[in-house]
């Protein structure tokens, strides 16, 4: 009985997610800038009305920040967008950013900034995996509306290697 309990404890410990989420080693923000399509995501409250055609556009700014425009189509056909700004918080890799969609006047408040960590990235920048260090948020993005099965599997593998539950992903139509 003691052996069974010890074996069970070891198995549960080994099956847990990695202690920390790891980003990619380096991101070229000029190559990363541009338009991305959301291929899959964890369900979240701020995208609850998005029914399809979910996109993100990133544009480098002279001050080093990144202009962010997120857009999606609702089920009634109307388009909504959210404009924000991102800033690099890890200058070594440029893979950890903070993003805010709150008005600039509130930017001094830490809670208006959300984590945007690039945890997977194709060598040719055709797909990216973005998550948060608490593993509550996850997105798979691509330069085209669809990813082929092999590329999607590589993106999911990057998320899974960081302890994200691939079963929670919802794919866009």
Which residues does each PLM region occupy?
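A beta-rich soluble binding module of mature secreted/lumenal proteins
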Residues: 2-3, 10-173
């Amino acid at each position: 009985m003691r052996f069974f309990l010890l074996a069970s404890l070891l198995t549960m410990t080994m099956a847990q997610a990695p202690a920390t989420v790891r980003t990619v080693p380096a991101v070229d923000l000029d190559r990363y800038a541009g338009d991305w399509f959301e291929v899959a995501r964890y369900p979240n409250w701020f995208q609850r009305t998005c029914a399809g055609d979910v996109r993100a556009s990133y544009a480098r700014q002279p001050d080093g920040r990144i202009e962010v425009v997120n857009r999606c189509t609702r089920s009634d056909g109307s388009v909504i967008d959210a404009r924000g700004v991102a800033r690099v918080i890890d200058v070594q890799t440029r893979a950890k950013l903070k993003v805010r969609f709150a008005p600039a006047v509130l930017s001094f408040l830490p809670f208006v900034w959300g984590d945007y960590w690039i945890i997977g990235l194709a060598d040719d920048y055709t797909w990216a995996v973005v998550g948060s260090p608490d593993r509550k948020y996850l997105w798979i993005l691509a330069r085209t509306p669809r990813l082929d099965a092999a590329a999607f599997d590589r993106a999911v593998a990057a998320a899974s290697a960081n302890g994200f539950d691939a079963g929670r992903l919802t794919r866009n139509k």
